[in-house]
Amino acid sequence: MKKLSGAEMVVQSLRDEGVEYVFGYPGGAVLDIYDAIHTLGGIEHILVRHEQAAVHMADGYARSTGKVGCVLVTSGPGATNAITGILTAYTDSVPMVIISGQVMSNLIGSDAFQECDMLGISRPVVKHSFIVKKAEDIPSTLKKAFYIASTGRPGPVVVDIPKDTVNPNFKYPYEYPEYVELRSYNPTVNGHKGQIKKALKALLVAKKPILFVGGGAITAECSEQLIQFAQRLNLPVTSSLMGLGAYPSTDKQFLGMLGMHGTLEANTAMHESDLILGIGVRFDDRTTNNLEKYCPNAKVIHIDIDPTSISKNVPVAIPIVGNAKNVLEEFLGLLNEEGLKSQTDLESWWQEINQWKAKKCLEFDRTSGVIKPQQVVEAVYRLTKGQAYVASDVGQHQMFAALHYPFDEPRHWINSGGAGTMGFGFPAALGVKLAHPEGTVVCVTGDGSIQMNIQELSTATQYGIPVVIICLNNHFLGMVKQWQDLIYSGRHSQTYMNSLPDFAKLAESYGHVGIKIATPDELESKLQEAFSIKNKLVFVDINVDESEHVYPMQIRGGAMNEMILSKPQEETN
């Protein structure tokens, strides 16, 4: 059995776990680990310019692959800088292991230089956390961390490692565990057969059923089963922001995204339904609006691997705890074995839905003479043939991308849904591109969000990571401005940004390509130019209509079907 120092154990454990990339930033408490990375090799380290960006890069890598992202930061400010990224991963159930350095064990609690209680600070935003007390525990602790992060409902796990446990002068026998035994942690992956049969029977007699798909369906890798099931029973399908791509957005049975900025047909169908089958969803406030008015005639069936999510916000008639893929396979098996089929004709239900679809709630003014954000997203969709990985920041541009770029595959839509973290999109896009070097990766951002982590242009230069940044520049914090327009009588308090840099020239100063677009006439040709450049990052700064709002938009405190539509529809209704 070979002997390794604690620092070497960290690196060798990551290698044995199959880690490809570590995203991080060195500092005193982790210098021995960084030296081991240099000495042992076998792992590519990406040196970021801020620890928050390291977590977002690992996040993008994880979301687009289903693998566990890995982060390495030093103690104190290195660890605390990572917290926002950890929160982002936690709220969206992203598998990640964050290794944080810690001061010497005998100095913990003494207010030592760069000491902070990482376990205490991170506890509310992690799935689990560990502190390593002796070097011999490093392999088993990391094995547990990766297992916990990737199983059940995934999430970030922090491993805090005091500096003395990675001392290079002491060697210990090394063996990486083949498996993990955690008696207190045993996620339920197979749904209860009685509940599954009960749910299927309820679904088959429903007159207005609808499938509501969330991010948990993507985590469960159940798209194939979901498509078979929905098409077998001719069921309408809608999705949360996080679930986009789990079911093909261009399929005729897909009603679009639901929720605050969901489509008319999706939100109205939910409100009018008599049965909702929720698959890997949280029923959070952005998808339910006023809970007291929520879908008054609907019985709810909820499939989720996390039992604490069931009936947390919406009362559930038939709960099913389990992996969505396994449960859907059980559904399909019952349909085949027992020859079950829908006992109701859904033709009249589809006629209602098609009437709502006919209103074309996503239409907008295409003749105004200024560039509309929707036009940009539609052009990006055409030019990428719908095959791009799209990493979005947070704001109006996020909603425009979700509504106007149809995703037909899972893990191609990368965004911060639960935390709504500005500054997420660009570093996440870099992580996605590292995971998919042959894929087209687009970052859709705004002039506000991009400045949150714009320093990562330097990281992209150092490692030659060619993504296309589409910056919808309206010189405002657009989503906040929209609320100020609609709710605060147009009082734009602290949302106008009058000191923006020349983004194109800034990108060029880092060695990238900068492109400016100011008029609709040049939009298509300059975007074509941007996507024709393959080996360099391209920053496309696009001046868009500053007065444009995201529609549809639910009325605050209303029911699912109470919505403000875009102006063209308001004029025709």
From Swiss-Prot:
InterPro entries in alphabetical order: Acetolactate_synth_lsu, AHAS_TPP, DHS-like_NAD/FAD-binding_dom, THDP-binding, Thiamin_PyroP_enz_cen_dom, Thiamin_PyroP_enz_TPP-bd_dom, TPP-bd_CS, TPP_enz
Segments crossing the lipid bilayer: none
GO annotation, cellular component aspect: acetolactate synthase complex
Residues noted as binding FAD in the record, renumbered to the chain: 153, 261-282, 304-323
Keywords for this protein: Amino-acid biosynthesis, Branched-chain amino acid biosynthesis, FAD, Flavoprotein, Magnesium, Metal-binding, Thiamine pyrophosphate, Transferase
Essential cofactor(s): Mg(2+); thiamine diphosphate
Pfam family, one: TPP_enzyme_M
Chain positions recorded as thiamine diphosphate binding sites: 51
Region (Thiamine pyrophosphate binding): 396-476
Cofactor binding description: Binds 1 Mg(2+) ion per subunit. Binds 1 thiamine pyrophosphate per subunit.
CDD domains noted in UniProt: TPP_AHAS, TPP_PYR_POX_like
Any single GO BP term: L-valine biosynthetic process
Enzyme class: transferase
Keyword Cytoplasm recorded: no
Signal sequence range: none
Binding site for Mg(2+): 447, 474
Catalysed reactions, as listed in the record: 2 pyruvate + H(+) = (2S)-2-acetolactate + CO2
Enzyme Commission designation: 2.2.1.6
Entry's Gene Ontology molecular function annotations: acetolactate synthase activity; flavin adenine dinucleotide binding; magnesium ion binding; thiamine pyrophosphate binding
Protein origin, superkingdom: Bacteria
Pathway: Amino-acid biosynthesis; L-isoleucine biosynthesis; L-isoleucine from 2-oxobutanoate: step 1/4; Amino-acid biosynthesis; L-valine biosynthesis; L-valine from pyruvate: step 1/4
Subunit structure: Dimer of large and small chains.
Note: Contains 1 molecule of FAD per monomer. The role of this cofactor is not clear considering that the reaction does not involve redox chemistry.
PANTHER family given in the database record: ACETOLACTATE SYNTHASE CATALYTIC SUBUNIT, MITOCHONDRIAL (PTHR18968:SF13), THIAMINE PYROPHOSPHATE ENZYMES (PTHR18968)
Family statement drawn from the similarity comment of this UniProt entry: Belongs to the TPP enzyme family.
Protein name per UniProt: Acetolactate synthase large subunit
Species for this entry: Haemophilus influenzae (strain ATCC 51907 / DSM 11121 / KW20 / Rd)
